[in-house]
Amino acid sequence: MSTAKPTSPKRNWWNFGKKGQQEGKAVEKDESFYRAGQWQLVWWKFRRHKLAQIAMLVLGIFYFIVIFDEFIAPYDPQKRFKDYSTMAPVSVHMIDAQGNVHLPFIYGFERTRDPVTLRPVYKEDTSKIYPIGLFVPGDEYKLWSLFPGNIHLFGVRPEPGKFVPLFLLGSDTLGHDLLSRIFFGARISLTVGLIGILLAFVLGLILGGISGFFGGLVDEIIMRIIDVLISLPTIPLWMSLAAALPQDWPQLKVYFYVTIILSILGWTTLARTIRSKLLSLREEDYVMAARLDGESDGQIIARYLLPGFASYIIVSLTLSIPGMILGETALSFLGVGLRAPTISWGVMLQDAQNLQTVAQTPWLLWPVVFVVLAVLMFNFLGDGMRDAADPYVT
């Protein structure tokens, strides 16, 4: 009885070497790693925080308006239109009274008076249509106080002897366009937070760094000063210091000193953060190696310690900006900060102190909407940066 001899599978020996090389390359490719730096890891995590990205976009639009507000605002913020005071926001239309479709336009207005309150009333005249155009000539200005021009981003093209108000957010009691004033007010209300935080950053970095790195008696003195400052009520302290500013000072000087007042208490939280980080890092081996290498104390702090938690410092600064914005708004609203004719969101809200005025002209509260929006966007951005900088958050 014969048995079949088992046959072994045929092997293409001439392809074995090539296949092995390909598998080896695949393994090498799979085992290769990309080395990402700290900031790149932070950016990857930040990109997954959609709310923070939206906040960054909105704040970017705000600061773009701040830079180019002379061009973007439809009117000069100091110009008064006496015939259109306390005018409600105008309505933008695309379909006229006959049902025809147009590009965005507004109707003309007829000014009358309420027979009971004697307040001016503006009624749309549907027989007159005024298209809204882009790059429209209007009030003259100097962009950044350097480049003269009269072209505005949008507006109603002027007619000889005829003015048609494009008050998208209404006008105030003096006939100023609220939208233009909000754009210009953002220049102060949004920059006071950045400048105040910059001053607070310098103070917090220096005093917190000295306290955390050297410790001992210096640390005790600085910490007790911080404890005293934190125990002080913020708003009353700001009010008392701002009220001490002379009434005849130029507004630019008042703006500078209000910024300093806002930063007086803003540096304490950052200083405590830097101190705690330095206390935990100053005894590390790489710090000792830097000392043995002859590095000075300042070089050790700047080159080896601060970069290790720079992301936390940025997050802390970002979350502190809303407090500065609210502080300026509160001081100006109460009349002890910036004053008219300076334009800021807080100064604009002085018209809304009277409850009866607010009831009759609620559009005077539009600056509140922008203050709340700016504060929320900074908080959302700070939350996203904090989550991105935290290594324990995935």
Feature names for model-found ranges:
Residues 171-394:
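Alpha-helical transmembrane segments of integral membrane proteins
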Residues 2-201, 205, 301, 337, ...:
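Gly/Trp-centered helix-boundary motif
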